[in-house]
Amino acid sequence: MAARRAVNQSRRLPDSASIPLVSSLHPKSRSTPLLSVGLVLLGAFLLIGYSYSSSGASCTSEVHRAIPFLKKAYGQSMRKVLHVGPDTCAVVSTLLKEDDTEAWGVEPYDLEDADSSCKRLIRKGFVRSADIKFSLPYRPKSFSIVIVSDALDYLSPKYLNKTLPDLARVSSDGLVIFAGYPGQQRAKVLELAKFGKPVKLRSSSWWIRYFVQTGLQENAAATKKFEQAASKRSYKPSCQIFHLVS
């Protein structure tokens, strides 16, 4: 199980007194070249930040947006849901607010940085940490639907061969996979420090071939209902979503 590493996402700006631009604004100083350099650097940072933010949100965040459409696709089967992936506490909290829905979560990474609401879910037994490269501590068909996000992208085929069948084992009505697009590579690189390993983003054709090779079948009925519901609301997911038969 890969440990989370502390990530400092904010960059400390130097004090204004130490910035050459401040002292160089005197009319007799050489302000124009320094000001130009400062503006260029600022523009570069803004462009880099935009490129990362626009290249795709996490697939776990996408799960929140997809819940209404998953309910349309699976109906009563959404009564007992297991989510597997990072930030599972947030997903479980959202699912528990839905009518007639019970939810549990498995966090593939350490929960040492969990906030108070997440720790409360852990104490109540709704969320647990587990290494998904090994068999999950649940009996067969313990859940009606299993949703996995931002977890399989970090597994090699060696471990996928064990993890995917096990996820299907604990679900009775379907397995839903949220996987990143290869075009999200730049955004996912930022998560390297968080998850401790490089991401392996695959194309839809790769996943489809893999499902066939491992004997996992597409849930055509759920796929059709999901796409119809999404189309009516003009919902376009930022991640690949696969519906599989358990």
Predicted segments with their positions:
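Short alpha-helix
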Residues: 196-222, 240
